[in-house]
Curated annotation (Swiss-Prot):
This is Fatty acid desaturase DES3. GO terms for molecular function: acyl-CoA 15-desaturase activity; omega-3 fatty acid desaturase activity. Pfam families: DUF3474 (PF11960), FA_desaturase (PF00487). Delta(15) fatty acid desaturase capable of converting hexadecadienoic acid into hexadecatrienoic acid (16:3(9Z,12Z,15Z)). The double bond introduced occurred between carbons 15 and 16 resulting in a terminal double bond aliphatic chain. Can also convert linoleic acid (18:2(9Z,12Z)) into alpha-linolenic acid (18:3(9Z,12Z,15Z)). Involved in the biosynthesis of the aliphatic side chain of sorgoleone, a phytotoxic secondary metabolite playing a direct role in allelopathic interactions. The gene is DES3. Its main location: membrane. It comes from Sorghum bicolor.
């Protein structure tokens, strides 16, 4: 039954009142348009940070491939259950590093040579069962619409109406680890809730007709890698392939989901999401969050410097730290300094758990909205939600 105009007006008023308490921290309004333009941020970044070196980028590929090969050879030679868990953790992290380099290829920050980017991107992403062009195109949509409730592509919030329609079991799974950390393969096939399409089919709503050849090429490469894994299973046994490749692959998926989620969620400041005329590329990009991963920063190519990356994805990863330092005086309070990590970023697990307890949906109404909490989802949400008000 359609809502009356009066009911809609009441809902809008309630949403604004609910969000008002979330909006200000120490007098700072995170949802207010910043006093600077994106050109001001761009001008603060040193000129050399924009330069791409294909040789330097290829060096990182060679380095990571050498580490992956060495780890695989060592684990296969020792073949000990005392070693396998350590191998899975380290090799899975290296698979994730492959993703980040392929991600740079997709943005064109790897080099100015589109052919080189495509070749390297396909090799790296096909190895970890990602259709390179299919993902590249959807990720471009994510960057072009970051922070937009309706148009963002990945990890965008559920509206309250859509959230209420989810079956109880679906709600529980979505916000209960480890399921949220295993969603990426499903996303490749089915996209996010409320969106249709697959990253493998050129007929998907994700793509335009001109993308057809690229999508078919990447899906073919994905199928070749899958066939290779099946052949290895026949030759050496499925258990050996599971130990050498399958478990590290799952670890890399967990890294991918953890990092991409926490770059857009979990900050104590309760960052805004936008609709309509309130959204802009700059305001959407400023809702992203930098994270510190300790000594893993260098292993996964400084992916934690996410704010500047989202504003200027063409900057190579090896310049992102310097570019971030240069831009911080311009960004001011719109840049949130990441919590300093220990050697291992174990603190981020607490951030993830807290966010999953309180960040459930946004209002159906309003152009500047904030995550709200379903207090009935589990017994621990209420206290956490009240602490944030």
């Amino acid at each position: 039954m359609a809502a009356t105009d009066h009911e809609v007006e009441e809902a809008v008023a309630k949403a604004r009142e609910d969000d008002k308490s979330r909006r200000q921290v120490d007098g700072f309004d995170a949802g207010k348009a910043p006093p600077f333009r994106i050109g001001d941020v761009r001008a603060a970044v040193p000129e050399h940070c924009w330069r791409k070196s294909p040789w330097r980028s290829l060096w990182y590929v060679v380095r990571d491939v050498a580490v992956v090969v060495a780890l695989g050879a060592a684990a296969a030679a020792m073949d000990s259950w005392a070693v396998w868990p350590l191998y899975w953790a380290v090799q899975g992290t290296m698979f994730w590093a492959f993703f980040v380099l392929g991600h740079d290829c997709g943005h064109g920050s790897f080099s100015d040579n589109a052919t080189l980017n495509s070749v390297v991107g396909h090799l790296l992403h096909s190895f970890i069962l990602i259709p390179y062009h299919g993902w590249r195109i959807s990720h471009r949509t994510h960057h072009q619409n970051h922070g937009h409730v309706d148009r963002d592509e990945s990890w965008h919030p559920l509206t309250e109406r859509r959230y209420r329609r989810l079956p109880p079991r679906a709600k529980k799974l979505r916000f209960t680890p480890p399921f949220p950390l295993l969603l990426f393969p499903l996303y490749l096939f089915y996209r996010s809730p409320g969106k249709r399409g697959s990253h493998f089919l050129p007929s998907s709503p994700l793509f335009s007709p001109k993308d057809k050849g690229d999508v078919i090429l990447s899906t073919t490469c994905w199928c070749i890698m899958l066939a290779f894994l099946l052949a290895m299973s026949c030759a050496f046994g499925p258990l050996q392939v599971l130990k050498m490749y399958g478990v590290p692959y799952l670890v890399s998926v967990m890294w991918l989901d953890l990092v991409t989620y926490l770059h857009h969620h979990g900050h104590q400041e309760r960052l805004p999401w936008y609709r309509g005329e309130e959204w802009s590329y700059l305001r959407g990009g400023l809702t992203t969050v930098d994270r510190d991963y300790g000594w893993i920063n260098s292993i996964h190519h400084d992916i934690g410097t996410h704010v500047i990356h989202h504003l200027f994805p063409q900057i190579p990863h090896y310049h992102l730290v310097e570019a971030t330092k240069a831009a911080k005086p311009v960004l001011g309070r719109y840049y949130r300094e990441p919590h300093k990590s220990g050697p291992l970023p174990l603190h981020l697990l607490g951030v993830l758990l807290r966010s999953l307890r309180v960040d459930h949906f946004v209002s159906d109404h309003g152009d500047v909205v904030y995550y709200q909490t379903d207090h009935h989802l589990n017994d621990t949400t209420t206290d956490d939600a009240h602490k944030q008000k």
